[in-house]
Amino acid sequence: MARLADYFVLVAFGPHPRGSGEGQGQILQRFPEKDWEDNPFPQGIELFCQPSGWQLCPERNPPTFFVAVLTDINSERHYCACLTFWEPVESTQEVVCTDNATEKEEEADGGGQARLSSTAPAQPGQLFAPKTLVLVSRLDHAEVFRNSLGLIYAIHVEGLNVSLENVIGNLLTCTVPLAGGSQRTISLGAGDRQVIQTPLVDSLPVSRCSVALLFRQLGITNVLSLFCAALTEHKVLFLSRSYQRLADACRGLLALLFPLRYSFTYVPILPAQLLEVLSTPTPFIIGVNAAFQAETQELLDVIVADLDGGTVTVPECVHIPPLPEPLQSQTHNVLSMVLDPELELADLAFPPPTTSASSLKMQDKELRAVFLRLFAQLLQGYRWCLHIVRIHPEPVIRFHKAAFLGQRGLVEDDFLMKVLEGMAFAGFVSERGVPYRATDLFDELVAHEVARMRADESHPHRVLRHVQELAEQLYKNENPYPAVAMHKVQRPGEASHLRRTHRPFPRLDEGTIQWIVDQAAAKMQGAPPAVKAERRSTVPSGPPMTAILERCSGPHINSARRLEVVRNCISYVFEGKMLEAKKLLPAVLRALKGRAARRCLAHELHLHVQQNRAVLDHQQFDFVVRMMNCCLQDCTSLDEHGIASALLPLVTAFCRKLSPGVTQFAYSCVQEHVVWSTPQFWEAMFYGDVQTHIRALYLEPSDGVSPTQETGEAQSQDDERSALDVASEQRRLWPTLSREKQQELVQKEESTVFSQAIHYANRMSYLLLPLDSSKSRLLRERAGLGDLESASNSLVTNSMAGSVAESYDTESGFEDAETCDVAGAVVRFINRFVDKVCTESGVTSDHLKGLHVMVPDIVQMHIETLEAVHRESKRLPPIQKPKLLRPRLLPGEECVLDGLRVYLLPDGREEGVGGSGGGPALLPAEGAVFLTTYRVIFTGMPTDPLVGEQVVVRSFPVAALTKEKRISVQTPVDQLLQDGLQLRSCTFQLLKMAFDEEVGSDSAELFRKQLHKLRYPPDIRATFAFTLGSAHTPGRPPRVTKDKGPSFRTLSRNLMKNAKKTIGRQYVTRKKYNPPGWEHRGQPPPEDQEDEISVSEELEPSTLTPSSALKPSDRMTMSSLVERACCRDYQRLGLGTLSSSLSRAKSEPFRISPVNRMYAICRSYPGLLIVPQSIQDNALQRVSRCYRQNRFPVVCWRSGRSKAVLLRSGGLHGKGVVGLFKAQNTPSPGQAQADSSSLEQEKYLQAVVSSMPRYADSSGRNTLSSFSSAHMGGHGKWSSVRASGRSSGLGSDVGSRLAGRDLLSTPHTNGAPPDSGFLRPQRAALYIIGDKAQLKGVRPDPLQQWELVPIEVFEARQVKASFKKLLKACVPGCPATEPSPASFLRSLEDSEWLIQIHKLLQISVLVVELLDSGSSVLVSLEDGWDITTQVVSLVQLLSDPFYRTLEGFRLLVEKEWLSFGHRFSHRGAHTLAGQSSGFTPVFLQFLDCVHQVHLQFPMEFEFSQFYLKFLGYHHTSRRFRTFLLDSDYERIELGLLYEEKGERRGQLACKSVWEYVDRLSKRTPMFYNYTYAPEDTEVLRPYSNVSNLKVWDFYTEETLAEGPPYDWELAQGPPEPPEEERPDGGAPQSRRRVVWPCYDSRPRVQPDAISRLLEELQRLETELGRPSERWKDTWDRVKAAQRLESRQDGRGTPSSLLVSAVPHHRRSLGVYLQEGPVGSTLSLSLDSDQSSGSTTSSSRQAARRSTSTLYSQFQTAESENRSYEGILYKKGAFMKPWKARWFVLDKTKHQLRYYDHRMDTECKGVIDLAEVEAVAPGTPTIGAPKTVDEKAFFDVKTTRRVYNFCAQDVPSAQQWVDRIQSCLSDA
């Protein structure tokens, strides 16, 4: 029995002492005046009576009622029922009411009445003051309190003849039962009657309707969020204008938390004066009036629930973990069925007529039942995870959190983890974990209804029925007697508060009330206490939680087969069948990723320990330790699956004998795991073992098990009693035992705990002390690092005390082991553990002190034992490891560091790792890493014995290293943590290595330093290309690039010194200039041939330099420059010639200028430059000042058809053309005084414009009226037959087309440029393409003859950043979290590499269009050596078929990249000075663009895709000197540019990549494209949209059998033995073999048919003893035979056969058959669209075309008999006319044949080249063609006569001369 009310208080309004606008509450009277002993009077009650503050009102408000809750220091709750009414203010009372205070007032109570506004100031006589009647009770009977206080108020207001003192006295003396379902009727002496019902079980909360109201106000989702927030200890704040609703909401939320009790701050109604409580750091559930909502806005970590608005606001910084699935969705569905039953019927065709909805009270219980089911599902089986540590004198119970989470597979679940770590669950364990107590509904539910709930999950109606059954029980608990007599309580009238004749509430007589209270107290003392006996029983445990399969196990869900493999392997180990065990070991290690296999291993090992088979030999010991380490490596610090618990007794049992008296146990080899350094693991293990021994203590010997059994899991057999059952029985018997027996049991339990503490001190010392105790740090410091890709040793973990540092912070764990010895750290760790577990287990202080004394001795003894073990273990013979495989080295390649044993680990690539991806497990591989002067090489063999004896090779050039990172990884064999290195290269290779344990840290560091030294040498002369095969003489110190270079005189001297050293040692020929054949232009000359090209002394002084003649020394330099690629190409293009007399017609628009021969104007330009004829050399110096790096515009290519020129330069300076354009429309005095450089620049550009034939006659206006339609015809090739030929106008301004993010916005969907017809008829003669940022604000004048085209281009740093992302996408360092093709494509897209390729192709194609339409283009971007080079190279490649040959592409690279100064050394970071800048793949990006074009036009390129990969590999490898240094100037300074000219070709090593390519091309067709069938004058227009681009396989391919295939000498492995060499008697073996894409080199093991036949032919020739024929000659002969055969059979013409030989979608849109020599063309068009084809219909146009155009019409394939062919005009014999003939140059027969027509089979004549004496330029004679340039004539002088020839243009003539001379030189 308990008092219904403890105190009655009368509180009234009083003025504030500081005189502020608000008043304060004053307690007028309280009864009883003296505090109860068991319940003191709560302080601050006047604040809670008026939570919004004590304020006056201008009118009478109706009375209000609410119940506030106060919590005392003992966490006991007091319920304060407050009834407030208003009385007029007496005139004598001082009232202070300022306007400011009134403005701030908003509401006086929770009822929501209006406040006094500032517009109606109240007179003192009109104000009303609040007065409150308060009942304070420990019981929650709100309705009784409302009725009782209402009765007192009614007596006062209505003036009833009842004594208030008597009523209040009866109220304070009334007693009611606490629980048990009893019913009591009370009366307060005023004719009233009230019935009080107590709940059946007081542990179940009483909610009335609060839960249902909460769901109605907030909804399902919001309430679930608040529920999770309260459980995970977040701050929850309710807002409402009603205090009663605030109280009900808080009550409802607490009811939902049952069976957990909320133990933090709980204030349903918080007074305004205490709002600062909201800033407390601890969790809370608080209700605040909505009037103070503004003051809660700044709370950053508080979840606000607005009851009136129905919203829940969660701050961004707060994360509420949701319920784990499927509980979240299941709970939501059941709540929907309860709250909205009509939802299930809404879609029925014939819904039932009526649905009976539950009452509000019953719905409240149904909602609570849903959450009760939720907790039963969440906590099912929790009693099986309780550890009973002590039974007497009081139960001590601990919860095994890790086992509970592990059973459910919810270790990673944030919600459940936080719930189990919270204070509410700790209270739940201490309260409900007791085995012998009273039970309630939750205990029955979790013990007996779990199976039913699981069966009902898929049946919603059965779930709802169960919910209703539980709701009935909850309702019956609150209302045990349904038929309750009605209350009878006097109520005041409805408008009683408005009466004016109110009298104030009277002062009560204290004496009367106190007398009534004293009388009742005296009666209570004499009566016996009526206490209902509590029914206690054994709490049922219910079924154990069945093991849930690991949710994240993926492919490792263990099957019976995997467990069988584990058992077999262990059997083989203990039976000594080590070879069989070794074969099974990799499969076992993979299977041990699953929990079942790990438990199986522990069980099998335990069986062998029981059979006394724990002493092993060395090999058995190693196998067992490896399997244990594999088990433990996946154990978290929690050990949620009990694997470490099961292995702990085993690691102290298995051992091996090292020597007599010295035994090594397994624990010394499994210490490197984080679980051993986790205090929670040791505590759980300790409590589990103590429970086992306590249980054995109380079991009869016949019932139990021996105390020596080690248990990690609870026993679940039906015939055995659990520890909780034993404890329950003992607690039941405890009161019946004698005092002595009780004391004996207490001592036995304490002795058990004490002995286990000693036992665990020993165990912990075993696993914490390292084998080598002399180490200065603990082994555990490295545990748990995993495969972190950083060199940091810091540990970061979320698990509590999961690391050394964190465990120290949580009052356990190691201190910083660097500052103390190992023994001291272990002693402190063990002492903290002992303190914690012994204090919690109730061990006496004496025993605890004894333990502290014993721990240091235990540790010291173990250290002494370990010293002997460590000493003997060092004497063990080392495990025999695989023999190191020596790598194959290049000639001249030397080993810098011999092999260091490493493991090559799998990176993020899926190939080669086996498993689910398929294929053999080639990685991880065991071997060694070698560092040579050229490469980093790994050679080894896979660790998986099932793969076989496959050699794994992975290497890359040292110069290609881009990133080196130290990592810490687990070795794949012994699962130990080792230091490692991750090396990434720009050749798209990755070496992820873990050093073997025998490799010391010093050796690893030496390897890293040597690698760094080789990667970044101090000088370029220390690179492999220079040190290979030559001992160069050290020159002067390396030039510092930042210095201002030497003077012109010094530079000239240096240049001449190097030129004389390399060229001058040969005599200078005095013959006229005869250009060498194209076959030998770029090669060192034959040994017996002089290789000088001299400029004759007959030079005219005014032809090359406008001011003075060349000096003799300059002429030697000039002759060297003439040989360079630039000059050779200029002569081919007709841009300028250095003929015998160097005389040029003045009509030639361009000339070769030697102004930069000493590199005085621009060091990054070549020595000879093409400039307009009219520009003098002295003006070029001034022009160069307008451009960055002095790189002024020079011509680099000229269109043979439109005569438009392509120019390149650096970006413009501010005073260049930009300045002119900005000021051109506003004349001013400053404009007249323009800078001379700008004027010279303007003249220069004007000269370029004037050099174009069709613009030369125009007077400053680019009117194109004379521009014929023939020039607008399409002469290009599209990359698809289906290309649309729609004409698409792009607006009137090229600049606006190019400007913007997407550069060109064309309507073509595939990214193709518009057709030629898109250009407007009136366009500029010259387009200057520049950077948009540089040309910002420029408005070109349409009257100008050039036009600026501002575009947005990427910078070098963007290329570098994009390349880094591309590297990580193609060669990731670690496996993707979601391995799928989409993840690779997403990474590829994020790199933006293909977007940059797209932009480059798009700009290039547009420039091609402009050039093809007759406009010249100047590309002037950045400094002119990166993007500019990429664009101009691509433009020439697309426009000129010559550059698509092997020789032409070489010439293109030499000219545009090498001679024009691309900074290869700077962009490739070749030296230490460039280390900070890093690698920028500008040239590689260009090669990728060429690869994209090659894919779309495979028949237009003479070279193969492999050639591009070869260049991409070797431009970074530094094997050759070709791609070193930044300009010709630097190469001359080092003496490199001409050094190969004087050397002989017989050397072993090639210094030039081109020489290497030439040598290989003669031996193998690897660089040749068999589908090569070019069409001259083809302008390629590739599609450039990202969707049309492909990822280059250079980035992704892998050849683990031999490494990268780009070093040909290394890629050629030993030949396979012939079939006849099989051993005698051997069975015939199949020649079939498995080809692994990531292992084998597919071109070698699966060669294409042509290569295979060529190899076979060569082999047969060798067998027959015949000299082998070159493959190219064989191929040419085969093609000629094919052509001859097709001609004889009449199956078609050669050109059509060539087209049909390859997929025709790669061909042009038209196929042409020539009917006569220059006659009309018959078009067989594949598409009717004329704008996309290459057709012409007029023979007049055909006659005017260049020779290359005619060549495409007469084209056939190359053959043995047709080395070169084309049309030449030949003058007949004496007095015979000139006539066009078809000439064929035959290298094989060494003759020049001519035919009347191309199709003729019989020749008209033959010129034997053996009789030719000279080939010289000729002069026109009578009857020669009129339209041909005089330089197109040449003569062939033989021993018999002189033949006069005429080509159709100068380049064709030069080509014929070169070809004929090439044949002569080869003879």
UniProtKB/Swiss-Prot annotation:
Residues 1723-1750 have a biased composition (Low complexity). The keyword Protein biosynthesis does not apply. GO terms for molecular function: guanyl-nucleotide exchange factor activity; pseudophosphatase activity. The modification N6-methyllysine is found at K1222. The modification Phosphoserine is found at S1120, S1746. Residues 203-336 form the cDENN domain. Expressed in sciatic nerve and brain (at protein level). Expressed in Schwann cells. Residues 705-715, 1260-1269, 1281-1290 have a biased composition (Polar residues). Residues 1761-1865 form the PH domain. This is Myotubularin-related protein 5.
